[in-house]
Amino acid sequence: MDSFLPFSRPAIGDEEIQAVEKVLRSGWITTGPQNHQLEQDFCRMFGCKHAVALASATAGMHLTLMALGIGPGDEVITPSQTWVSTINMICLLGAEPIMIDVDRHTLMVDAQTVKKAITSRTKAIIPVHYAGAPCDLDILRGIAQEAGIPLIEDAAHALGTRYKNEWIGEHGTAIFSFHAIKNATCAEGGLIATDNNELVERIRCLKFHGLGIDAFDRQIQGRRPQAEVVEPGYKYNLSDIHAAIAVVQLSKLESMNIRRRQIVARYSTALKDSPLQMLSVPDYEHIHAHHLFMVRVNKDVCGIDRDTLMERLKNKNIGTGLHFRAAHTQKYYRDRYPQLSLPESEWNSVTLCSLPLFPDMSDDDVDRVTDALQEIISEHR
């Protein structure tokens, strides 16, 4: 049998290993010069005004919501069809997540659905750039500006994504992820990009105990003046070990995304006549980062359900993923919102399947996946 083909595998080479070794030998391994380098490189690459490196994108979401003063009695609009961390952070701040449905074919939030969900208690709107494609930001920004509500972009899937003439993260506030399966990784990490001067100052303060200055800053200043707590904060800083990996990964991002694009093109050609339904791409100008390649497995059309298909692929040593089961179908949120019905999110939750996609995949790997899919489906039709 062929060796196991994972759903994702980080493209780590000698450069990343050497970068980590350099940090380990430097004598300074926590937040320091590599974090500053990462933030500077990110701003240079994507044209953003400020970048704040953090321990995770979840930490970034938490700090951004907190910096905006969101708390009990407030509402935050976001799709249920996303990773649960966003909804979790809203709840942990005592606010109410207003989970809305998405377009069945793109998994993007619909602008009119967002507009209808706005109330006098709405304090933020969080759209998700899904699978590497951008939301229609012009319309969403217009709605947010008209209502006087901050727009926070969940850009965990959108590293290297462009919307019309701008990079995601170039304008407004966007939160990125360097998790192990992302387009650029440092195992665990995240970053907030923003052009809001006041917001970034509060985020920088909150990320490290509310001190407003990190350990490296204090070290190079000889710990004078002594830092003081401005307000209670968290410990969400990123180590330089992780940042060093991210710096190298960012330098490779363009080439890695090009390879992702080639893999997706090969998948798309092989599966164009398949009963598996691929995601539709937006009809406005954009550059797709191809973080995920997903198909929908509709049993009525394919003769097999998603879970059975994933199990059959596993038996052939092919890994898959699920991105995502809608948050409102998870136990805690089912119990909290028993009447909430979001048909498009629910349909996608039981049909979505993410196929292997990572830069080091060979064309033979792609063909192995598509051949296996066609073989399995042909047995059930």
Swiss-Prot record:
Its EC number is 2.6.1.87. It comes from the Bacteria. It catalyses: UDP-4-amino-4-deoxy-beta-L-arabinose + 2-oxoglutarate = UDP-beta-L-threo-pentopyranos-4-ulose + L-glutamate. Pathway: Nucleotide-sugar biosynthesis; UDP-4-deoxy-4-formamido-beta-L-arabinose biosynthesis; UDP-4-deoxy-4-formamido-beta-L-arabinose from UDP-alpha-D-glucuronate: step 2/3; Bacterial outer membrane biogenesis; lipopolysaccharide biosynthesis. Its cofactor is pyridoxal 5'-phosphate. GO terms for biological process: lipid A biosynthetic process; lipopolysaccharide biosynthetic process; response to antibiotic. Homodimer. Belongs to the DegT/DnrJ/EryC1 family. ArnB subfamily. This is UDP-4-amino-4-deoxy-L-arabinose--oxoglutarate aminotransferase. It comes from Photorhabdus laumondii subsp. laumondii (strain DSM 15139 / CIP 105565 / TT01). The lineage of its organism: Bacteria, Pseudomonadati, Pseudomonadota, Gammaproteobacteria, Enterobacterales. The gene is arnB.
